[in-house]
Design a protein with these regions (language model features):
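Active-site anion-handling motifs in enzyme catalytic cores
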Residues: 1-347
Length: 347
């Protein structure tokens, strides 16, 4: 977790960079048009966040057909915020990409989110489903206080949580919020059908990892006795991707899921990608509650299985058993939840 000094340093640095940003005419053609901005759009290599951005824009295009959906990459936030503010009217809609970064673990993104909310005080703002986690460190407590102060002051802000722990925490700090699934769960990427073979392992190797290297090695060895085992992480080494590049990367990983007999993962969107492609999946917990919390939305689909205890024998047994597929039933429930968001934000 970041120290208070580091958080303050980055906050001041971001504010100065935004204040001294050079003017740009890139958005001038949008002046006078009805716009829906997608702020903090993921143009970096986390395909989970990229998928959230994609799904959010798809949903907005259906719900607000009379609005132009404007993708604002997170990498352009500081340099373009003033220009965007100047071309927006009070009738334009501001949306903020969902995810798992309302925290001091990814404090730089949380600082940017607060800057966006402050910049558009006269606009309707929708913050798509988030996982919230602030540590008990001095830095975490400060950022949590800033979040409460910033978000509670806005008169037309809709905040949404994607699991019950975040929802309850938001309520505890007096934020009015909705409980909704991760927006990626609204997608259907089960087509085109392809022949399935082998197992895809999608496992973390970062600060949220919880599986030991020895466990992963032994699991791979056991699985390799009966299956071809491939690796495909939801994190790729790319920055500053265009919208077309993002969609290409998403199609590649969705195709990988569709062509696998099983996906084994400890990544939230590894689990969700398996769900939306109709792929049997075993998912392990990570070092926070977001996987367990989000799994509750899809636990009855019949082909995605959360294993709280990482036991290799149990994994092998589960893979050997048949699965059912209740995607359509669960998908209808998930999509019905977002009707609530549409009603709340159209008032």
């Amino acid at each position: 977790m970041a120290s208070l000094v580091k958080i303050l340093y980055i906050k001041i640095r971001f504010c100065l960079k935004c204040f001294f940003a050079k003017s740009t005419s890139v958005y001038d053609s949008l002046r006078g048009k009805k716009k829906c901005l997608v702020m903090l759009a993921a143009d970096y290599g986390n395909l989970g966040d990229v998928a959230i951005t994609y799904a959010q824009e798809q949903w907005l295009a259906v719900q607000y057909p009379e609005y132009e959906i404007v993708d604002v990459p997170i990498s352009k936030t500081l340099s373009h915020l003033k220009a965007l503010k100047n071309i927006c009217s009070s009738t334009d809609i501001i949306t903020i990409v969902g995810g798992g970064n309302m925290s001091d673990l990814y404090f730089d993104i949380e600082i940017l989110r607060q800057m966006v909310v402050k910049a558009f005080q006269n606009n309707r703002i929708i913050s798509f489903p988030q996982t919230l986690f602030f540590s008990d460190t001095l830095g975490g407590k400060f950022l949590k206080w800033m979040a409460k102060r910033t978000y509670s002051k806005h008169k037309n802000l809709t905040i949404t949580a994607r699991e019950i722990w975040s929802f309850n925490t938001m309520k505890q700090i007096s934020l009015d919020c909705l409980l909704l699934p991760d927006i990626v769960m609204t997608l259907d990427k089960s087509e085109p059908k392809v022949e399935r073979s082998g197992i895809t392992m999608c496992l973390r190797n970062d600060k949220e990892a919880s599986l030991s290297k020895d466990f992963v090695h032994e699991l791979r060895e056991r699985l390799s006795l009966d299956f071809a085992v491939a690796d495909y992480d939801t994190h790729i080494d790319k920055e500053g991707m265009s919208v077309a590049e993002r969609e290409q990367e998403l199609e590649m990983i969705w195709t990988s899921c569709r062509s696998s007999q099983w996906v084994i993962t400890d990544r939230l969107h590894g689990m969700i990608f398996a769900f939306i492609t109709g792929t049997p999946c075993i998912v392990f917990p990570n070092n926070n509650y977001k996987i367990e919390g989000c799994y509750k939305w899809i636990k009855d689909c019949g082909y995605v299985f959360y294993l709280g205890e990482c036991n290799i024998d149990d994994i092998i047994k589960r893979i050997g058993k048949p699965v059912t597929n209740k995607y359509n039933e669960i998908s209808n429930i998930i999509n019905s939840k977002f009707i609530q968001l549409q009603k709340n934000t159209s008032q």
